[in-house]
């Protein structure tokens, strides 16, 4: 099968067909280009997706990736990044091995096609020229033959006419002979041109056109083969990255199999374990029996020798407000909301054995008053986060991490010690290097001046000493915490028993539960006595504030036991300091022994105000 023999007369159709073939090739090139753009865009989107979910440095997200599930997710993100890289490889290989190669081949193909069809048109024009010469020779031969016939007929007519002179007859004969010769010459020329045309025509249809069409056929077949090879390359480019993509997927599977739910659960314990023991049982509070309260100086002195009783008067406030100084807390509160009780009817205090009772006051007013200082929270959590909650709002973290639970504090301190030790080791290595360099300079002065290293060596030595002092400080705190952790169960039980005696359940829960719902914590100092549970770290924030000054004195006219929150018990005849006079609500704020503060009914005391203090 040959286009030269089978399609010898389809020159124009072959020209259209070969142009269509080039268009198909260019269409395939465009397809591959768009595929490479898709691969690049897909790879870019995958990389952006992987980058988007990568943990940010020095953020809370980075700490979350200690869990195996998060580590597996991080591995998945990294594998997806490599996966995106393989799609970039696909794009690059398709561009270099297919697109660029085919574009160059298309240019060569267009040039070859143009040359072949140029040769075809040239041969076609040549045969057309030969045909025109043949037609011209044929017409000339035909014309000469006709003129020769007419000249012969004219001669015969003149020769037969007796009236024509002999000269005219001779002239007609000569003219006929000339025309006859011209016809013979035209015949010979026509014959020669015809023979030549036939030769050219045979060569055109049997040599030139078959050769040209054969070249065009081979060109077209090469184009078809080339596009097939490009399609194979297209598949091979994809196949080459399949093993690497498979490894990426295997990496994701391996990361998924590395997830350990038990390990993650243990990490949660390590991250949030406080080191405390659960609170003890709450004792039954029998309201049918009268509560015993200390109302005399003798009971006050006796309570110092032994374990103090739990009272609702001034002494009990050390238990009610374990995290705040007395004067600071009381400065936040107003006088009791209900009116004070009237003085007893009997002039003698002994006529009223138990003294007048101030009206029962619900627990809610105190919470309302305390809300002036704190945001609205459930009463059971009223004082849990008072210390650290304020420090968090102020953005302040104690250097010794005392706002963390014991276990978490120990981990923070241990981490700080490890960091300092690493810095010390780094500075020590630098000092050793400088020392060695100085020794080299001493042995070989031409290499450098040893004195030039003295200042640097001094700075490094000072840094090491500073870091060691810092490390010793944190190691001391760490030793303190580690020494305190084993005894925390006994301490927790002691504190639980201490606050179980309180009748105010809200305050009891606040004292036992040190951790607020938002995770803040106030650490207890185990060295403090049982009857005075305070938070020194929180107290330090108010050390710069002085207690309210006394503006006068007062003498108790009647005994007042002060059962309600915010009140203080007094004994008839007792002298106390006045720190806030009656605001018109019937209550006067007093202080006893620079330690206890509270409100008493104004009618129960006789007030002697200091004029200078009042005026100021």
UniProtKB/Swiss-Prot annotation:
Region called Interaction with FASLG, residue ranges: 552-609
Region Required for interaction with TNKS, annotated ranges: 513-616
Annotated ranges, domain SH3: 549-610
Record's keyword terms, sorted: Acetylation, Cell membrane, Coated pit, Coiled coil, Cytoplasm, Cytoplasmic vesicle, Cytoskeleton, Endocytosis, Lipid-binding, Lysosome, Membrane, Phosphoprotein, SH3 domain
Entries under SUPFAM superfamilies matching the protein: BAR/IMD domain-like (SSF103657), SH3-domain (SSF50044)
Residues carrying N6-acetyllysine: 66, 110
Phosphotyrosine: modified positions: 499
The F-BAR domain, residue ranges: 1-264
Residues flagged as site, Mediates end-to-end attachment of dimers: 166
Domain named REM-1: residues: 403-480
Tissue: Expressed in brain and testis.
GO biological process, one term: signal transduction
Residues modified as Phosphoserine: 296, 299, 348, 358, 496, 520
Transmembrane segments: none
Region annotation Interaction with microtubules: where it falls in the sequence: 1-334
Compartment(s) of residence: Cytoplasm; Cytoplasm, Cytoskeleton; Cytoplasm, Cell cortex; Lysosome
Lipid bilayer topology: Peripheral membrane protein
Region (Interaction with DNM2 and WASL): 552-608
Region listing for Interaction with DNM1 and DNM3, in residue ranges: 534-616
Coiled-coil ranges per UniProt: 67-259, 398-490
Record note on domains: The F-BAR domain binds the phospholipid membrane with its concave surface. The end-to-end polymerization of dimers of these domains provides a curved surface that fits best membranes with around 600 A diameter, and may drive tubulation.
Functional note: Required to coordinate membrane tubulation with reorganization of the actin cytoskeleton during the late stage of clathrin-mediated endocytosis. Binds to lipids such as phosphatidylinositol 4,5-bisphosphate and phosphatidylserine and promotes membrane invagination and the formation of tubules. Also enhances actin polymerization via the recruitment of WASL/N-WASP, which in turn activates the Arp2/3 complex. Actin polymerization may promote the fission of membrane tubules to form endocytic vesicles. May act as a link between RND2 signaling and regulation of the actin cytoskeleton.
Protein name: Formin-binding protein 1
Organism name: Mus musculus
Gene: Fnbp1
């Amino acid at each position: 099968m040959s286009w030269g023999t089978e399609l010898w007369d389809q020159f124009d159709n072959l020209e259209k067909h070969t142009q269509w073939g080039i268009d198909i090739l260019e269409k395939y090139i465009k397809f591959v280009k768009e595929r490479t753009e898709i691969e690049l865009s897909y790879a870019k989107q995958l990389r952006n997706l992987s980058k988007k979910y990568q943990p940010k440095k020095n953020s809370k997200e980075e700490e979350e990736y200690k869990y195996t599930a998060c580590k597996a997710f991080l591995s998945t993100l990294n594998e997806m990044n490599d996966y995106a890289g393989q799609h970039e490889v696909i794009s690059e290989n398709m561009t270099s091995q297919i697109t660029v190669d085919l574009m160059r081949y298309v240019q060569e193909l267009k040039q070859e096609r143009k040359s072949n069809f140029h040769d075809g048109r040239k041969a076609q024009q040549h045969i057309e020229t030969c045909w025109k010469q043949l037609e011209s020779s044929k017409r000339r031969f035909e014309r000469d033959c006709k003129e020769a016939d007419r000249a012969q007929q004219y001669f015969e007519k003149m020769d037969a006419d007796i009236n024509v002179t002999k000269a005219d007859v001779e002239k007609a004969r000569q003219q006929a002979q000339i025309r006859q010769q011209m016809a013979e010459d035209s015949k010979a020329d026509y014959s020669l041109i015809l023979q030549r045309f036939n030769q050219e025509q045979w060569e055109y249809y049997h040599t030139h056109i078959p050769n040209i069409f054969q070249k065009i056929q081979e060109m077209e077949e090469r184009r078809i083969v080339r596009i097939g090879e490009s399609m194979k390359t297209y598949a091979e480019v994809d196949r080459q990255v399949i093993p690497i993509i498979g490894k990426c997927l295997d990496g994701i599977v391996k990361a998924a199999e590395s997830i350990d739910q038990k390990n993650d659960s243990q990490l949660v314990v390590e991250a949030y374990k406080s080191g405390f023991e659960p609170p003890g049982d709450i004792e039954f509070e029998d309201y049918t029996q009268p509560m015993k309260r200390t109302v005399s100086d003798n009971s006050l002195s006796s309570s110092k020798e032994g374990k103090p009783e739990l009272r609702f008067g001034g002494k009990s406030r050390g238990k009610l407000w374990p995290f705040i100084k007395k004067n600071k807390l009381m400065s936040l509160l107003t006088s009791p909301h209900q009116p004070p009780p009237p003085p007893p009817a009997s002039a003698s205090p002994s006529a009223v054995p138990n003294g007048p009772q101030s009206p029962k006051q619900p627990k809610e007013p105190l919470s309302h008053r305390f809300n002036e200082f704190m945001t609205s929270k459930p009463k059971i959590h009223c004082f849990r986060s008072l210390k650290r909650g304020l420090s968090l709002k102020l953005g302040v973290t104690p250097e010794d991490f005392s706002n963390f639970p014991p276990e978490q504090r120990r981990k923070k301190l241990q981490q700080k010690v490890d960091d300092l030790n690493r810095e010390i080791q780094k500075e020590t290595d630098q000092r050793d290097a400088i020392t060695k360099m100085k020794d080299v300079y001493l042995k070989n002065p031409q290499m450098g001046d040893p004195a030039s290293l003295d200042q640097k060596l001094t700075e490094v030595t000072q840094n090491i000493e500073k870091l060691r002092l810092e490390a010793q400080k944190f190691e001391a705190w760490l030793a303190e915490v580690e020494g305190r952790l084993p005894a925390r169960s006994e301490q927790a039980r002691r504190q639980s028993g201490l606050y179980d005696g309180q009748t105010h359940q809200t305050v009891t829960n606040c004292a036992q539960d040190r951790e607020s719902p938002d995770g803040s914590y106030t650490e207890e100092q185990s060295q403090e006595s049982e009857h005075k549970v305070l938070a020194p770290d929180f107290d330090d924030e108010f050390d710069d504030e002085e207690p309210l000054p006394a503006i006068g004195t007062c003498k108790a006219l009647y005994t007042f036991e002060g059962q309600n929150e915010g009140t203080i018990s007094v004994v008839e005849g007792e002298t106390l300091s006045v720190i806030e006079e009656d605001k018109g609500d019937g209550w006067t704020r007093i202080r006893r022994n620079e330690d206890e503060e509270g409100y008493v009914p104004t009618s129960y005391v006789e007030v002697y105000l200091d004029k200078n203090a009042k005026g100021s």
